[in-house]
Amino acid sequence: IKYLVPEGAMAQLGIYGAITKIAVVMMLFYQMYRLAAEPFFLSNFRKSDFVAMNAAALKYYVMASMLIFLGIALFRDVFALIVGRSFREGIFILPVVLGANVLTGVWLNLSFWYKREEKTSLAIVVTGAGLVAMMAFGFWFIPLWGYYGAAWARLASESAMVGVSWWLNRRFYPTPYDWRRIGEYVAVALVV
């Protein structure tokens, strides 16, 4: 943001940083999930057990994430009180930042199979897709919209990583994720 929005860049950066501090609640949930799930899923399960548990875990992760998303988004005016008054103008980007944080957990869940199968070189492909999306959308959106563009660029980056992880999963390690139910959780949260 600092170099892409020359006029008022530090103010833009401050607003974006303040709003991401509110969204840290979602990242704390993600970290707790990661610290519990990674050792669990990387232990020695039969493939059929691993696939079933991984599919169920993603569904429940998204369900819990959507509850946290709703709790923060619906009470964003209360959460806005923890940041300075001059930073509150950017509170409208909070749902976008929260959405990006949810997607971080989704692609983590989609990555367990290649960690388990010791194909971690695929992580380079996934993060490379995220990097390309962040750079492309960042250079396009940030000069136009400032911190709003930065939030959308991050969401695009996380979406790209989820998309590539999903594609790799479908191709090399098909897992029966309940995408219909997961989509329902997301749709209900977005409607509310």
Residue positions per predicted region:
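Membrane-interface junctions at transmembrane-helix termini in multi-pass inner-membrane proteins
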Residues: 42-46, 98-129, 169-171
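Helix-loop junctions and terminal segments of transmembrane helices
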Residues: 19-59, 111-116
